[in-house]
Swiss-Prot record:
Residues 201-216 have a biased composition (Basic and acidic residues). It comes from African swine fever virus (isolate Tick/Malawi/Lil 20-1/1983). Belongs to the asfivirus B407L family. Induction: Expressed in the late phase of the viral replicative cycle. Residues 127-216 are annotated as: Disordered. This is Uncharacterized protein B407L. Keywords: Late protein.
């Protein structure tokens, strides 16, 4: 018989080194408890069934190693019909009583105590009459009603012997190995179903994220490395406390930088709770996330405005009313289009920040810098040209020298207003 014993306690090897001694009874010997747990052995229920079956067979004088009694053997006296019209019950009883003479009292008590033949083998014969003989003769009979000598001729004293039904044949032909195989398959299928359900529930959790498990994983890694270097667990907890405090200080400094930037940009921080060193790590992380979201929201909307206004400026330069579109005979004039874009984009700052945020969330820092400076490269020449043109118009107006001062003031004002568009 193969050894199916396995040790579940082996998975707990070294667990006592990870326990905090401050929260455990001083009288408890953790190493001894660990050895006791690891020494526990667990076996399949079929092994326990085999032990009980072998003990029962030994008490009745049945040898399972006999090939004639094997349930899987082609020569088994159980798996085939008896010749000469004899019943399967009679053959099984004759086979069980082969060898030394066994008293009727012992067999009868064994049947009554262990129910070997009461239901599936010799139930009909046992109920047919009382015991007639007190001893076995030449191993050919069991008792007066179940296994009489007349079985040899295929008839009992009460009439012809009844054959076993097909249901009893299937029961007797059901081998122990088949039972163990089906049990193992059912156990494996049950574990597979459970594992699939666990994986489904695991990935269906809405709050599960890689961000939530990274801190705990890093802490376990640091603890294992500390224990491998023969460090004291108590000193590790002190280092962890210092490490958490240092992490809080770094995050609080980042919060101060964000607050300073938002204040300089005149961006309101109302509704955001500013944490302190005594606040939990979760509160500090929430504050950083809110401040960062408010900061990048303004920046992303500005990037979208600069890109779209740059495109409008390009259309103004290309289509200024003097160039004709080929095959259409149309000369569009987009002068001042950027002013319309500025008004529309100011009303859609939230939408533009969302669009840009979705685009740049997976971009590298260098790509974000290029995205910030790219629109400025397009807008800067147009801005310089506008300033130069305004200066030239103002200079020409002053050189002309109108006689009426009020007329000169109005012309200068209109010129500046036109060039600032």
């Amino acid at each position: 018989m193969e050894d199916t014993t396995f040790l579940e306690g082996a998975n707990l090897a070294g667990i006592t080194t990870l326990m905090n001694n401050l929260h455990i009874n001083e009288q408890a010997n953790l190493e001894e408890l660990e050895k006791q747990v690891m020494g526990k052995q667990q076996s399949f229920p079929t092994d326990h069934f085999d032990e009980e079956l072998n003990g029962l067979a030994k008490s009745l004088g049945i040898n399972f190693n006999d090939p004639e009694f094997s349930l899987d053997s082609a020569h088994s006296v159980i798996s085939k019909k008896p010749s000469g019209g004899g019943s399967i019950r009679g053959d099984l009883c004759r086979h069980s009583m082969r060898g030394d003479k066994i008293s009727h009292e012992k067999i009868h008590s064994g049947i009554r105590r262990d129910s070997v033949c009461s239901d599936s083998v010799c139930s009909d014969s046992i109920r047919s009459g009382s015991v007639r003989g007190s001893s076995m003769h030449d191993g050919s009979t069991c008792d007066g009603s179940a296994c009489d000598g007349s079985v040899r001729s295929g008839r009992t004293r009460r009439g012809p012997a009844r054959s076993s039904s097909s249901r009893h044949d299937r029961i007797h032909g059901y081998s122990l190995s088949t039972h163990r195989k089906k049990y193992a398959e059912s156990e494996a299928s049950q574990k597979t179903v459970i594992s699939k359900r666990d994986r489904k529930n695991h990935y269906a959790e809405s709050e599960y994220s890689e961000k939530s498990i990274k801190p705990s994983t890093k802490q376990v890694d640091r603890l294992i490395n500390h224990l491998r270097s023969n460090g004291d667990p108590n000193s590790f907890y002190k280092k962890e406390h210092d490490y958490d405090r240092k992490t809080k200080l770094v995050k609080l400094e980042r919060i101060n930088m964000l607050l300073t930037y938002l204040t300089n940009e005149q961006i309101s921080t109302d509704g955001i709770k500013i944490p302190t060193i005594d606040s939990s790590m979760q509160e500090i992380d929430d504050a950083i996330e809110m401040l960062t979201l408010r900061n990048v929201g303004i920046r992303y909307s500005s990037i979208a405005e600069e890109i779209l206004i740059g495109l409008a400026r390009g259309l103004e330069i290309v289509f200024d009313g003097t160039r004709e579109i080929p095959f259409l005979n149309y000369r569009p004039d987009y002068t001042g289009l950027h002013n319309t874009f500025m008004i529309k984009l100011f009303k859609m700052r939230y939408e533009t920040s969302q669009v840009v945020g979705n685009l740049v969330q997976n971009m590298s820092p260098l790509s974000k810098i290029c995205l910030e400076l790219g629109p400025s490269l397009l807008l800067y020449p147009a801005l310089i040209r506008t300033k130069h043109k305004a200066s030239e118009d103002l200079y020409n107006l002053l050189q002309k020298g109108p006689e009426d001062p009020f007329t000169a003031y109005n012309e200068i004002h209109e010129t500046l207003k036109k060039n600032n568009k």
